[in-house]
Regions:
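Acidic-enriched catalytic cores of C-N bond-cleaving enzymes acting on peptides and small amides
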Residues: 61-66, 85-115, 134-210
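Alpha-helical metal-binding/catalytic segments enriched in His/Glu/Asp
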Residues: 1-11, 71-73, 80, 87-103, ...
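Acidic/histidine-rich catalytic neighborhood of metal-dependent amide-processing enzymes
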Residues: 1-64, 112, 200, 204
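Long, well-ordered mid-to-C-terminal structural blocks that present hydrophobic/aromatic surfaces
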Residues: 190-248
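Single conserved hydrophobic/aromatic residue that forms the stacking wall/gate
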Residues: 254-263
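Short beta-strand-to-loop capping motifs
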Residues: 73, 131-135, 228-232
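Short amphipathic
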Residues: 51-54, 67-75
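A structural signal for small-residue-enriched, beta-sheet-centric alpha/beta enzyme cores
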Residues: 82, 115-124
Length: 263
């Protein structure tokens, strides 16, 4: 006999599947049937792990004579971290961080605010940061961003033709993230892998293993939270890519949450 199980509310956290009681079904083999298109079924799925890290920071004073501005990444297509990860689209968190890292090495930069991405299973489309740099460097910063934007927009001209970098003046911020934490945060985002890690050796064109740097959020209590998700159709590779991300977090000496929702 064939048993059919229909669950609901899977996209928000597999709540239907997790509520399934042991022994409810009798079969030895489970075929997962899934699709976003009516009339089509996918047989099989990737397992996944969410890897989360949290920075605790101190607030420090922004020195007088510093100019505050907001740097934004906009116009990316984003997409599903499973179905679209192979398309090579830009990740707003990675691209913003790339410019912030460059800027922090060149100027006396204070990171006041950072925010990027939203859902754990979506490729980040937008991100922004509020930074403060010496007044004397504000014109040079705009030139730097123009040069940087031209280079990166050329890199993504085919897959993300609407990519934009925007620089806007911002009201003065009295406080910023302490320099040590800001440096470790930028280094962590830079080093954290994102994208396809391995392709299937059995099915041409099928992604086997991937990872998504989903979001960077400031939380109450002086917390900055980085959420990532790893997927693989092979259990050992899933654990391997999750360990890779976890190792990057450990090198930054930050708090790491236990992997959530492994499946």
């Amino acid at each position: 006999p064939i048993e059919c199980l229909f669950t609901v509310d899977e996209e928000t956290g597999l709540t239907g599947a997790f509520a399934l009681k042991e022994g409810f079904m009798n079969g030895d083999i489970l075929l997962n049937l899934d699709s976003e298109d009516e009339g089509e079924l996918f047989i099989g799925c990737a397992g996944g792990i969410d890897s989360v890290a949290e920075f605790t920071y101190r607030e420090v004073d922004v020195p007088t004579g510093h100019f505050c501005c907001k740097v934004q990444v906009k116009g990316l297509k984003g997409g599903h971290s499973g179905g679209d990860i192979h398309l090579g689209r830009g990740n707003a968190n990675k691209l913003l961080n790339r410019f912030l890292s460059q800027t922090s090495q060149k100027y006396d930069m204070y990171l006041c605010e950072i925010d990027g991405g939203n859902l754990r299973n979506a490729i980040a489309r937008e991100a922004y940061a509020v930074i403060a740099i010496p007044d004397a460097d504000k014109h040079a910063l705009r030139t730097d961003l123009n040069v940087f934007a031209a280079e990166v927009e050329a890199e993504y001209a085919v897959v993300d033709p609407d990519l934009q970098f925007v620089l806007e003046s911002e009201a003065a911020r009295p406080k910023a993230i302490d320099k040590d934490t800001a440096k470790r945060l930028l280094q962590t985002i830079y080093a954290a892998p994102h994208g396809v890690y391995a392709m299937s050796q059995d099915i041409p064109g099928l992604v086997e293993t991937s990872t998504n740097l989903a979001s960077v959020k400031m939380k109450p209590g002086h917390i900055i939270r980085i959420e990532t998700s790893q997927r693989s159709s092979t259990a050992s590779s899933k654990q391997d890519i999750a360990n890779m991300v976890r190792t990057v977090f450990e090198l930054s000496l930050i708090h790491i949450s236990e992997p959530t929702r492994p499946y």
